[in-house]
Curated annotation (Swiss-Prot):
Swiss-Prot/TrEMBL keywords: Cell cycle, Cell division, Cytoplasm, Isopeptide bond, Metal-binding, Mitosis, Transferase, Ubl conjugation, Ubl conjugation pathway, Zinc, Zinc-finger
Effect of residue 345 to S: Decreases the interaction with CDC123
Class in the EC hierarchy, top level: transferase
Protein's name according to its UniProt entry: E3 ubiquitin-protein ligase DMA1
Compartments, record wording: Cytoplasm
The keyword Cell cycle appears for this protein: yes
Species in which this protein is naturally found: Saccharomyces cerevisiae (strain ATCC 204508 / S288c) (Baker's yeast)
Quaternary structure note: Interacts with CDC123. Interacts with PCL1.
Covalent cross-link Glycyl lysine isopeptide (Lys-Gly) (interchain with G-Cter in ubiquitin) as placed by the record, residue numbers: 150, 204, 217, 237, 240, 260, 300, 306, 313, 317
Enzymatic reactions: S-ubiquitinyl-[E2 ubiquitin-conjugating enzyme]-L-cysteine + [acceptor protein]-L-lysine = [E2 ubiquitin-conjugating enzyme]-L-cysteine + N(6)-ubiquitinyl-[acceptor protein]-L-lysine
Gene Ontology terms: biological process: cellular bud neck septin ring organization; establishment of mitotic spindle orientation; mitotic spindle orientation checkpoint signaling; protein autoubiquitination; protein localization to bud neck; protein ubiquitination; regulation of formin-nucleated actin cable assembly; septin ring assembly
Gene name linked to the record: DMA1
């Protein structure tokens, strides 16, 4: 297993000052700063070598070519294809004067390119679309910029797809935390199985550039890959997996067969592998996930979101006498468009932070701030609720006070 950080000039030369790689993609929090482009192989074993500087050459892994180097691209059928660019996303890409090509798609590499590559037309993806399928029309620059993040990279988000039609929890697939990956045009993100060798490799690079790996034995070590072109179009490919890749419940190819590149859309459902032994153990469950592309999952705060959050803060201030701006569990700020849980005692937290406390003794809940016990299943028509409302009849109208304070802050005068 090796991780190669690719220089912007041939290895035997000192990189020029203007390398064409954005300095914002340097990650100094690592002992060895990571710069794009980067490349990882998940399948080829490293070969011991006395000269550690030549390991990437002697073990047959190779490195990604520099922008000016002549490159050899191994196509899906194992033959050299000189008509495609240096960032071919369906094969191992190596320098012709550095390392031999590995003629198998199972040695497919994970590589991430930076944004704004020079001579973009020379770095076109090696895309093989299914019959009767064509690429979408090219988009204008304003639309293209909206698809990018602030660094000029495209993004993809994977979240677990909970199959509500399944009667068994075991058949709902493997649960995982949301995964977000970012990549420049021409990049390829490997999908595979999590192993110790993978762990060692990805520990050297930032999370957003990791391969997409899962702890499930029904997924091949190199199961498939995502590709992204210069228009922000994302593609899915099965790379000879044994248990299959499914897009919207349709298998892409038969076992141990490389599939075509299928264009992805927001909301598509992907399944990796099939349950083994009934999926009774998590390690034998398939992975079902929904995809969201190019920041489409991000919510923009509007006036309603901001006003709702302001009401929550004012409610806490009026009921507890304290102004709470941060989540007391994670100590981060509570912001608009975030999922928030508000307890009957008016304390609030990020739902992600308090979820375990909510489900631990549900429906009983003890506030971690004031230690108040409450019943989350109490109905609005219960006697205790009615008594609570009657006791508060003589109390000032908290809601009116909140409205007054919000409008005063906004410079608006209430008129009866």
């Amino acid at each position: 297993m090796s991780t190669n950080t690719v220089p912007s000039s041939p290895p035997n030369q000192t990189p020029p000052a203007a390398s064409g790689i954005a300095t914002s993609h340097d990650h100094t929090k690592f002992n060895n700063p990571i710069r794009l482009p980067i490349s990882i192989s998940l399948t080829i074993n490293d070969t011991p070598n006395n000269n550690s500087n030549n390991n990437s050459v002697s073990n047959g892994l190779g490195i990604l070519p520099s922008r000016t180097a002549t490159s050899l691209v191994v196509a899906n059928n194992g033959s050299a294809n000189g008509n495609v660019g240096a960032t071919a996303a369906a094969a191992a890409t190596v320098e012709t004067n550095t390392a031999p090509a590995v003629n198998t798609t199972k040695s497919i590499r994970h590589f991430i390119y930076p944004p704004n590559q020079v001579n973009q037309t020379e770095f076109s993806l090696d895309i093989h679309l299914p019959p009767n399928t064509s690429l979408p029309e090219r988009i204008d620059q304003s639309t293209l910029k909206r698809r990018m993040d602030k660094h000029g990279l495209f993004s993809i988000r994977l979240t677990p797809f909970i199959d509500t039609s399944s009667t068994s929890v075991a058949n709902q697939g493997l649960f995982f935390d949301p995964i977000i990956r970012t990549a420049g045009a021409g990049s390829q993100i490997i999908i595979g199985r999590y192993t110790e060798r993978v762990r060692e490799a990805i520990s050297k690079i930032p999370d957003q550039y990791h391969p997409v790996v899962f702890k499930s034995k029904v997924i091949s070590r190199t199961h498939g890959c995502f590709k992204v072109d210069d228009q922000g179009n994302w593609f899915l490919k099965d790379v000879k997996s044994s248990s299959g890749t499914f897009l919207n419940h349709q298998r892409l190819s038969s076992a141990s067969t490389t599939s075509k590149d299928y264009l992805l859309h927001d909301g598509d459902i992907i399944q990796l592998g099939m349950d083994f032994r009934g999926g009774t153990e998590e390690i034998y469950r398939c992975v079902k996930m929904k995809i969201e592309l190019n920041k489409s999952w991000k919510l923009k705060a509007n006036a309603f979101n901001k006003e709702a959050l302001s009401r929550i803060k004012n409610l806490q201030k009026l009921t507890t006498g304290l102004e709470q701006e941060d989540c007391s569990i994670c100590l981060n700020k509570i912001k608009p468009c975030q999922a928030i849980f508000i307890s009957p005692c008016a304390h609030s937290w990020h739902f992600h932070c308090v979820r375990r406390l909510v489900i631990m003794n549900y429906p009983q809940f003890m506030c971690p701030n004031c230690r108040t016990n409450c019943d989350l299943e109490t109905t609005l028509e219960s006697e205790s609720e009615s008594e609570f409302e009657n006791e508060d009849e003589d109390e000032p109208d908290i809601e009116m006070d909140i409205d007054m304070e919000i409008n005063n802050n906004l410079g608006v005068r209430l008129v009866d």
